[in-house]
Amino acid sequence: MLLRLELSALLLLLIAAPVRLQDECVGNSCYPNLGDLMVGRAAQLAASSTCGLYRPQNYCILGYLENERKCFTCDSRSPYNDYHNPSSHRIENIITTFQPERKMKWWQSENGVHEVSIQLDLEAMFQFSHLILTFKSFRPASMLVERSKDFGRTWKVFRYFAEDCANSFPGISEGPAHSIDDLVCDSRYSGAEPSTEGEVVLKALDPSFDIHDPYDSTIQGLITLTNLRVNFTRLLTLGDTLLTRRKRNPQDKYYYALYEMVVRGSCFCNGHASQCIPVDGARGDTFTEPGMVHGRCVCQHNTAGYNCERCQDFYHDAPWRPGGKADSDVCKRCNCHSHSEKCHFELARYLATGGVSGGVCDDCRNNRIGPQCELCGPFYYQDPQRSVDDPYACIPCDCDLDGSVDRGLCDPVNGQCVCKQNIEGERCDRCKVGFYGFSRDDPSGCQLCRCNFLGTIQVGNPCDPTTGRCICEHFAYGSQCDQCLPGYWGLGNTVYGCIPCDCDIGGALKTECSSVDGQCKCRPNMVGQKCNDPAPGYFLAPLDFYIYEAENAAPLAVISPFIGPPPFVYPTEGIPERPTKLPLCPPAPKPSSVPYREHITVQPSPAPHNPQVTLPMCEHYFRQRGYDFKISNGRLVVVKREKRQTRRRRQGQRTIPFEPGSPLQILLRQRANDQSITWTGLGFVRVQDGAGLRFTVSNIPATLDYYVVVRYEPESTDDWTAIVSILSIGSEDERCPNDQSNKMFTLPASGRTATLDLPVCLSDGNQYHVDITFRKQPSEDPHSSSFILIDSLGLIPKVESVPNFCSQSYLSQFQQYRCIELAVQAGGQTLPEVCEMLIGSMSAFIHNGAVSCNCHHVGAYGSSCSKFGGQCQCKPNVIGRCCDSCAPLTYGLGPNGCSPCDCDRSGSTTELCDQTTGQCSCRDGITGLQCNRCYPGYYGFPLCRRCQCNRLADICDPITGDCLDCREHSAGRNCERCEEGYVGDPVSGQPCEPCLCPDLNGSGRFFAFSCNKDPRSGAPYCECLPGHTGPQCDSCSPGFYGDLRLPGGRCKECCCNNNIDPRDGDACDPVTGECLRCLHNTEGPRCQSCKRGYYGNALAQDCKECSCDRRGTDDSKCPAGSPCFCDQDTGQCPCRPGVQGALCNECDDGYWNMDGDYGCQPCNCNREHALNYICDKITGQCLCQPEYGGRICDECGPNHFGNPDLQCMFCDCNLEGTVHPACDAYTGECLCKPGVTGPFCDECAPGHNNNFPACEPCHACNHLWEKIISDLSLDAERIETMMPCPEDFRSRPELQHLQNLLEKLQNVLNMGAQDELKKLEELLARIRNETEIIDPNIIIIDPTLLLNTDIDYIRLEFNKLLKNLREKAKEGPVTDIKAVNDIFNKIKKFYDEFTDSEKKVEAAKKVQEASRKTREKVTLELAKCQIGEMDKLERKVKALSAANINEEVCGAPGDAECEKAKCGGALCGKCGGPDCTGSLPISLNASKLAEMTEKNITALRSQLKEADAQLRNASEMTSYVKDQAENMMDKINRTKTKYEQEKTDTKALIEKVKTYLQDELVKPEDIEKLANAVLSIQLPKSPDEIKDMIEDIKKILANITEFNDDLEYLEKQAKIAGNMKERAKEILNRTELINVKEIEKALNDTAKLHDKIFNDLDEAEQNNDVIREKVNETEPKLKNIEDHLNLTRAKTLLDEIEALKNKTEMNRAQGKEAKDTADAALNSANDTGKDLEELKEQFEKLKLNSTNQNVSSEANERLKNITMEAENLAKHVEDKMKEIEDLEEKILLSNERKDEMRKELEALQKEADDLKKFIVDKVQRYNLCSP
């Protein structure tokens, strides 16, 4: 009954819990409480290994100090029970139960099993928090934790744990993690401490990371799981599993043992539940297990599922998501407006609504559709009077079936019908705007109005809705209003529809244009929309285009000729049949070859009755008369330069008669810069009263009426009358009848143009002569001029006569703006825009389009010209409208234009030249293209005097008059002397005769510059060439060679590279030139190489003696008794193999023992055990790995044992109780000190006290009892050992099997292997004997395992030997018999050595046996307690110890500890010291002293030999002191270098020996070997003999005074060449031996001088800054000067500017040099300051140490030198300062000069600008002439 009540209460609690939790989760996320997931899941927990699960198993523990018992039994066959089965260690024991005796139960794995796993399987998805493992045993050396989310199908690693992560889990990064999902290895939980109750903690999420979204997929992947597995991969052991000194299996104490495992987590509900209930189908005991975490969520927030992972039905309007702070938008109820009870979620709708609604209703009722059933279905629409929830709100559609589509389908919201394409209205019952013709049969309902919207009125409907007729805009027509009326275009471009055409009246053929783009129809070569622009390459002619110059007209009156220069006749050309087709730029007439003169008469065209002759074109006429044309704005400006000797009638003009006796003269008008041009052409024709001119007109463009215009200039105030007669040469044109009578009009004196009142009609196909006679009207002034100046005749078309040209309005504008008056005026006035437009249109009308430019293909830059006027763009010096002629004073039309004539004014009669050849007209006696030189035989232009050459030359230099090409072997300026190689006197008529030196000049054997006559004897003598000597120069001088007997032989300088004495006649072979007496230690046919045994640059006289170390040098290149032969260029000595260094004085890496018989020998370091192949270059010791030793690392190292080919293991001995080395290198047996025992030498031996490590001996009587107890104990242990154990019986079959294997191995390994096994057996026996005394409680290893280990080692050795044997077998048969013999000999030698060693071992065994007997005797004596005898025996034993030996060898008693023994000993790693008197330190000191003494003796002997050789050579080679001094300096330097190198090497050797002796790993036998080597060094006899030898050397050197003087002089010269910094350093060096007391005053003076130098340098720096600023100011000024340079300036000005520029550059360079000098002086002064500071410090030190010293004369001399050099330094600085000041003055003068030049350039620039402005103004006022 009570149980039933409890169940009922629990059920009520479970039912009420969701209601309470629902309130807690409203609007917020909620989570179940954390708990231990292990609780209640014992059945779901499993382990891969558990001890005693099938049978009881023993296990042992480590460090169990509470009880003597160390081994226990595990029996897990039944569950754990405190009373009945406390030894059960099943996996369920690790679940936390909170029992009082919690530590009494645990889970434990089997012994020695490394890989063990524990797995927890959960029934649902849980959220994991952290894991805690509490171990009873050591924590694992490595382990990992895995998780699964799919109930064990796949696994992922949580975290790795290892003591050594790199070896346990290679490739896994060691912590810490950088992100939440980093997979790392943690080493914090895998150490050996603590040995129990150690923990391993794993947190799912590292708290160091800031987690923003706990429901992120990455986070969920880390914290959710269905299974958890812990994998232990390696046990943590203490290294004793490989030892061979245990009787029990060490694996028994290594296993995994866990007190508890806590897996903290909770039910995973995605934030939508705070409570969980059991999962369906789970265990039935869930209600009885307190603290269990269940797996099924009690979901809130309208969610469902085990983990609340989905929404409830009909709650899909918002997507499911994990719980958060605001969960109002999670799993919302769908809104279907009461028309459905089912829905689903669509992400696309949710995104489209901006996250408002994502639910889509299913199966809508009441004609409803839509995601929320909010729309009416097809053919229904929403009744606006009803709500959406009303089941009757959708009513049927009402559409016109003729105008709607889809059978009357309407809009479901407003009921609007779906109309046809062109129908509108709610019921689709009318046409849209812009459409017409409503019809049922039309698919679109109505037709589109076909109106052009550009031409249609856009107000309302553009067409009638019934008929479709369009309503047009203005000027548009057509049924669709898509066309413009004729004369209009641009439909829709304006508000008026179309715009009128605007075609040019002359350029267009008609006024109509294209209605699309307004393009008019143009005349030929006219372009543009209006046809008002000429095409490229064409132009429009101006109104005054047809001008006929008076200079080209023919005279009407014939006057008798007068005497004058010959006339200039122009070639004639025929007149073409069609004048209208005459080119506007006809070919230029060929220029005459007759030179131009100042007065030129022109033969005019023949009489008027000869129509086939015409005057040349105006451009040619002007050009041939030396006038320059310039173009500006379509106008021609003629410029005439002033010439010397030019007769002028008036300023700016000259006259040229037409012909002899003619009353007409051509008046050339000179243009002034400031005068406007009021004429055309070259100038005027001066016509006498009554005379006339005939103008030929043959280029009429069209049959029109033309106004006749005469341009003139009166010479008086009288009016003139012009009588005009027009005569047609061809037949009369009916279209153009003319009155043949004369016409008259007045030329008023106040005007410049006159126009015939009535126009004349001229036809385009005819040629006319226009005759004009000029009459002066009567005048009251009898002195008035009877001449008038006629400029030109012009024909101006009459606008009114042009048929159908322009309207009355255009004519009114033409007259209003006085277009004709402006056009006929000369001077190039700018026309108004109206006039220019009308004239251009008329030109296009008259010429039927534009006129071709016809630009000359050579003279013009292109084919285009100016649009109005047609002026082409001419190249330099090219003129004419077509750019077809050279400008005056130029010639040679070509690709680059025309070249200037450049006629020399002094030699030419005019500045004009032939325009084809460029030949100028020269004066008498002058020739040349530019008339700038004299005729051959004359010189001195322009005076041109005859050459003076003594009749021995015909021509001379045209400038200097020096004769050229003198004959009869004469030479000189006037051929007044004989040429080289001849002798005579040409002035006096004595001929030049050849010299014989020794043969004639030109014979190939003439070796003199010339010859001469002796003034006394008159005999000729030769002046020899360099290198020749003798009366006839027939032999070579010293230092020269050559075979003068051969043709072409010469004496050439001997090429010996400055390595011979040029004064020595025998220095080189006189015939071959081979060098015979080479100096400076050189050799070779050219002394081009250093001698053998020397190296360096022979070309620079720098050959030094080789300094090779004979120990490391190849014997063949370094023979005994002679110097070594090194590389003659680099000095590299030829080293033996394994030796390196320029002097072969150092072993190469991988080699050692420089003092060996064959140089350095290889290190041969063991590749497997050495860190690298390099060893110590003195001892050969390789750098071994920590566990290896020996010279080549082929042995086990100190404190290690084993087989070095397999493995060396640490001895694990107590170093305080062992000797050195600590253990046996092969067996590992610890070698204990006396009084110490134990397998690890860690306890005191019997008979000694227990104060380890001191272990003082007990009383002597104690040995009696000790021996008795020991014997009894040994006997008991032997009896115990002989008793068989059950385990021994079990292992006998296995031992038998192993014995069989050993026999097989013995057969394979032959005798050697049997011996080794025998030794191993003996070793095992010894080990067993030694271990008898071990404490029986200590764990003993089973001997079976030991034997297995030994067999494994033997097997490895056998495999290794077998592998080597197979490799040798693969190499094939041996063919090198000698190598085989050598190997055999080596093997034999090694065998002999092995035999000797074996004998020594046998002898040692005998000694050992004798020692054993001795010990037995001692023991026997001790047993008798004979104290006196025991003391004697102790003294004898001590005498046999190493202490006395240490004292004798190292210098101090050897019984002290190594830390306290200052001199060390045999076991201390060192021997000897500073105050030690042993044999070894004495020998070391003797070695150092011997080495130093040997160096001194060697140096002194070398100096003695050199001094002796110098004495012998000094008397024989006095003339070569300089060369000998240089050689001596080289030898001294080499000797110094050699001694310094030997000193350095010796220091390095001593340092290496010191380092070697200080090394703790050095063996005593190696120290002894090194000491013997030092003692074997030969020392001098006595120090007194050394002193005597030194004194003798000093005496000998003191006698060499003359040589020392020369050497001192050379050294002084070399020192003078040094810089100031080196002098300052020398000052410091010279003060080392000076007494301070007497030079303090000089030092103070030097300090003051130092301060003064600093002040001067500061001023120099300031001046330098001023100079730098001046230079910076000069550079922009110089740039301005360069920018203002003008090419038109005279050459002298350019030269001055260039000189100024060079001067400025020089100043800049001097300024920079001064700056560099000042900087160098400043740096030097700074260095000097530093050096002086160092001097002061040195003086202060010397002051303390030199109180009793006397001042020597040498010190005084050095002091004087210091003072003198300091003064020189100050003077040098002052000189530099003065140079800087001078340079500053020069820069100032240069700046003033530049300012003057700048002002002059500015004035010239202004003058050039004014001139340019005037020229431009004049060019603009002149137009080109007509063709």
Swiss-Prot record:
What exactly does this protein do? Answer: Binding to cells via a high affinity receptor, laminin is thought to mediate the attachment, migration and organization of cells into tissues during embryonic development by interacting with other extracellular matrix components. Positively regulates apical-basal distribution of Muller glia cells in the retina.
Where the record annotates domain Laminin EGF-like, the positions are: 267-333, 334-396, 397-448, 449-500, 501-544, 853-900, 901-946, 947-994, 995-1053, 1054-1105, 1106-1162, 1163-1210, 1211-1257
Tell me the domain comment.
Answer: The alpha-helical domains I and II are thought to interact with other laminin chains to form a coiled coil structure.
On assembly, the entry states: Laminin is a complex glycoprotein, consisting of three different polypeptide chains (alpha, beta, gamma), which are bound to each other by disulfide bonds into a cross-shaped molecule comprising one long and three short arms with globules at each end.
Query: Which interval of the chain is the signal sequence?
Result: 1-21
Q: What is its main location?
A: secreted
Tell me, according to the record, the phenotype of the null mutant.
Significant defects in apical-basal distribution of Muller glia cell bodies in the retina.
What name goes with this protein?
Laminin subunit beta-4
Annotated GO biological processes are: animal organ morphogenesis; axon guidance; basement membrane assembly; cell migration; retina layer formation; substrate adhesion-dependent cell spreading; tissue development
Residue ranges for the region (Domain II) are 1258-1449
Of the GO CC terms on this record, one is: laminin complex
The record lists glycosylation at 231, 1001, 1329, 1485, 1496, 1513, 1533, 1599, 1629, 1644, 1672, 1686, 1702, 1726, 1745, 1750, 1761
Compartments it resides in: Secreted, Extracellular space, Extracellular matrix, Basement membrane
* Keyword field: Basement membrane, Cell adhesion, Coiled coil, Disulfide bond, Extracellular matrix, Glycoprotein, Laminin EGF-like domain, Repeat, Secreted, Signal
Protein's UniProt keywords contain Glycoprotein: yes
